């Protein structure tokens, strides 16, 4: 009424924390900090993944969905390779005086099984559609690479960074893998 105003603090300011959605999803994919952060996210998954597959790398295939998860996948792959190389070194050191050439070759040839299990039709962008239309579209966006898994024997580990709706695996992939 008097035309006066004032500024006063009502609530104590809290720590400014960035939302992961804003930080990663809306950033440029070529930003070096985002690239490294996504790789670290993948590396951070290695220990829980190894426990989940009971450390059975011979019967585990690693992949990623959608394409935006590829950088985290590279980080996971690097972490798995570090683990496998440590394992190889331990096996060789433990058996160095008893190793036959064929056993040494078997140990050295061990690799992480990385495959492009799901293939997306890049012309279709499901996150911009709504409701039933989106669900129908999502069900037909992906196909799988047949023969990349041994049925009823292999584990499949997929990094999925579908942070908009998080429905890629549920609505598109799992149905075609069964």
Regions found by a protein language model. Give the residues of each.
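PRPP-associated nucleotide enzymes
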Residues: 1-178
């Amino acid at each position: 009424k008097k035309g006066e105003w004032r500024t006063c603090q009502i609530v104590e300011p809290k720590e400014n924390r960035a939302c992961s959605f804003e930080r990663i999803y809306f950033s440029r994919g070529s930003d070096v900090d985002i690239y490294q952060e996504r790789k670290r996210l993948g590396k951070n998954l290695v220990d829980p993944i190894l426990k989940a597959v009971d450390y059975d790398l011979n019967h585990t295939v690693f992949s990623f969905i959608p394409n935006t998860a590829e950088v985290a996948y590279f980080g996971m792959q690097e972490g798995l390779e570090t683990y496998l190389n440590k394992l190889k070194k331990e096996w060789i050191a433990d058996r160095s005086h008893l190793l036959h050439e064929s056993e040494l070759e078997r140990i050295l040839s061990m690799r992480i099984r990385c495959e492009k299990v799901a293939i997306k039709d890049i012309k279709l962008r499901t996150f911009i559609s709504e409701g039933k239309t989106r669900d129908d579209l999502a069900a037909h966006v992906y196909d799988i690479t047949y023969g990349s898994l041994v049925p009823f024997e292999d584990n499949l580990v997929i990094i999925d960074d579908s942070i908009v709706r998080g429905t890629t695996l549920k609505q598109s992939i799992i149905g075609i893998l069964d």
